[in-house]
């Protein structure tokens, strides 16, 4: 059974098909999942993710069931595999926002329903699908190729974008602080994919080098949820990595800025630049709804073929 845990498990054709279907559903809503049920499991708080999934299944004709950590026996020691067997047998889809990616893997092994990664410490694939739809809408993908820079932390967003760019054949540059590293295993996977797709991928510690000649600039919060006690240290380590007017001037003239939100002005992005690109950033957030719709339909179709 097909799950959506990481973009590593999806081909170029499948990823682009998801984005194209999302674009179609945005223009012409359809109730394609009448009476289907989505279980939403959250170990971490969420605004945009919960709204996107709950609205997506509802507008497609189904219903959502919200489950926080306090609602589950997992918090009392029940094995993940037992919870997966129960929930996976009762619903049509399971969406999970978890602290550890291993929880997703374990749940997917035992679930009879497809499992969707709505964020783990390693990957955030639904966000990248939303980003890709936004890039398509702003005409920043020429002949199937986008020129993208990621500036910031070597986190789940960076990992997911690295994988997507490698599979899709993009020109993709990463700039992270010197004492930060990309997972060697994820980097190796991306390099192998780049050989197949023709992607041009680079890694540096200089944001200006990464931004040169790019049409899309992506950044993310420096202090992720659960890292609040590391805020002071991380702000020092990321000094010089803010996306401001000077940084954007190095990118191509009409480059767009993407941010998965929440954004902290004065840290990863300046107030002026954020507001200048607010239209695209908030449309990026809205686009999560449509890519989730496309993803749910895809997984339902895959399950129907089994």
Swiss-Prot record:
EC number(s) stated in the UniProt entry for this protein: 2.1.3.3
Location(s), subcellular: Cytoplasm
Binding site for L-ornithine: 156, 220, 224-225
Annotated GO MF terms: amino acid binding; ornithine carbamoyltransferase activity
UniProt KW keywords: Amino-acid biosynthesis, Arginine biosynthesis, Cytoplasm, Transferase
Catalytic reaction list: carbamoyl phosphate + L-ornithine = L-citrulline + phosphate + H(+)
Keyword tRNA processing: no
Family: Belongs to the aspartate/ornithine carbamoyltransferase superfamily. OTCase family.
Name the record gives this protein: Ornithine carbamoyltransferase
Organism: Campylobacter jejuni subsp. jejuni serotype O:23/36 (strain 81-176)
Gene: argF
């Amino acid at each position: 059974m097909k799950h959506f845990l990481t973009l590593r498990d999806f081909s170029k054709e499948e990823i682009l098909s998801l984005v194209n279907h999302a674009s179609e559903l945005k223009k012409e809503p359809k109730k394609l999942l009448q009476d289907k049920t989505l279980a939403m499991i959250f170990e971490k708080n969420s605004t945009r993710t919960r709204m996107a999934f709950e609205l997506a299944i509802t507008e497609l004709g189904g219903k959502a069931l919200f489950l926080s950590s306090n609602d589950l026996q997992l918090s009392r020691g029940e094995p993940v595999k037992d919870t997966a067997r129960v929930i996976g047998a009762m619903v049509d889809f399971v969406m999970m926002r978890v602290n550890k990616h291993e929880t997703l893997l374990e749940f997917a092994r035992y679930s009879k329903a497809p499992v969707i990664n709505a964020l783990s410490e390693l990957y955030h694939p639904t966000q990248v699908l939303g980003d890709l739809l936004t890039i398509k809408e702003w005409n920043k993908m020429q002949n199937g190729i986008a020129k993208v820079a990621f500036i910031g932390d070597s986190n789940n967003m960076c990992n997911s974008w690295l994988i997507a760019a490698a599979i899709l054949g993009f020109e993709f540059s990463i700039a992270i602080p010197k004492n930060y590293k990309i997972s060697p295993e994820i980097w190796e996977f991306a390099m192998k994919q780049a050989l197949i797709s023709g992607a041009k991928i680079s890694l540096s510690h200089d944001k200006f080098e990464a931004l040169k000649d790019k049409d899309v600039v992506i950044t993310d919060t420096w202090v992720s949820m659960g890292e609040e006690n590391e805020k002071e240290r991380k702000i020092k380590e990321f000094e010089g990595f803010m996306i401001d007017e000077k940084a954007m001037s190095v990118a191509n003239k009409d480059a767009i800025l993407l941010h998965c939100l929440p954004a902290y002005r004065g840290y990863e992005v300046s107030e002026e630049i954020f507001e200048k690109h607010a239209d695209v950033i908030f449309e990026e957030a809205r686009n999560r709804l449509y890519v989730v719709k496309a993803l749910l339909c895809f997984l339902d179709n895959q399950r129907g073929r089994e």
